[in-house]
Amino acid sequence: MRIGILTIGNELITGRIKDANASYIAREMNIQGWRVPILMSVDDDEAAIKTALDHILGMADAVIVTGGLGPTADDKTTAAVARAYGLKLYRDEAVLRRIRGIFERYGFHWAPGNDKQADFPEGAELIANPVGTAWGFSLNVQGKLIAVLPGVPGELRRMLPEGVLPILRRMFPAAVSAVATRTFKLTGISEAEVDSKLADADLEGQGVEVGFYPDFPELRLVLTVRKKTEAEAQSILKNAEAQAVQRLERQIFACDDETLEGAVAALLTERKLTLAVAESCTGGLITDRLTDISGSSVFLERGAVTYSNLAKTELLGVPESILGEHGAVSEPTARLMAEGVRRLGHTDLGLATTGIAGPTGGTEQKPLGTVFIALADGRETLCRHYHFRWGDRRRVKVATSQAALMMLKRYLAAGSAPKK
């Protein structure tokens, strides 16, 4: 089955906000095994909305529309859809009472324009909004479905699975199939390299759809299998997963919704190890990512941003002679930072970063993007030298935090043991 997507709003066309709804809907349709052949955005203009609907329904069996269901004058979607198909609007008194009840419950001021949120085209099937005031609706137009939802992401993400998907399955029962999917998250490898490593597996020849989705600093490899039965789809996917892991195990850091910091946190917690972090060029980004994980206080003892040479000396014990001879961005300094923060925090592990994020500060010997990452465990101190060839300061910081967490994950996954 083919599903078109139409997002409506002047704020989308002018670039004032990012269209998160379209990507969410497309992803959910893919999970259901339905294809999205077209995605359009138009402004809050009735003629533009009608033209877009006609065009999309010429290519798709159904269209999911978002936006323009609010109470203000520029919210024109309901009226535009009704006029496009020669339908009259009616006011649903039950919905109106519910909306008024929400305003009264929270003490909101009621403006006359709020009434229009209870207006719907005749013959529409209403789609309840459990978290807001803008209800959606669907219409069957000559065997094709138009489903209209509010543009507020939090409301849309409740109403699509609870309201729209059941209607689609009921209206197009033959289109319901089994879809099995797995997302691998990789780092430190390009799309071309992944494609080359998977070439001999011939996954597509086995009925597996292979998709590459760069999302800096990671690359997502998505494997999808569509079959008549769940058992058949899962069997083919399981075999494809094994082949992908065999070829890409070193670059894979997580699956599906798991994050790199989440994977690191799970390993630290499982092994009952503690960590202290000293950051220079990353400015606290590693610690920030780790503390996004609930319960991180179990393993994260402290994080120190030692940006200046004085901080490296006073807090971490890096000798001035080392800084003078090798510089702040060097392997000896990174090693001593990791050892120093481990000693300071009395932890099992110490992780440190130092580098030149740019756009200034680079030299011929140490160009922009030069980074050293060290990991100390009391037995040995590992150090890696990286050169991130981007002029963007933020990208260098993010890439460094990613490499540091990946270094830590590999250490933990290998079963290495710190000195107790």
Swiss-Prot record:
Superkingdom of the organism of origin: Bacteria
CDD domains named in the record: cinA
SUPFAM superfamilies the record matches: CinA-like, Molybdenum cofactor biosynthesis proteins
SMART domains, per the entry: MoCF_biosynth
InterPro entries documented for this protein: CinA, CinA-like_C, CinA_C, CinA_KH, Competence-induced_CinA, MoaB/Mog-like_dom_sf, MoaB/Mog_dom
Cystine pairings recorded for this chain: none
HAMAP family to which the protein is assigned, alphabetical: CinA_B (MF_00226_B)
Assigned protein family: Belongs to the CinA family.
NCBIfam families, sorted: cinA_nterm (TIGR00200), PncC_domain (TIGR00199), PRK00549.1 (NF001813)
Protein name stated in the entry: CinA-like protein
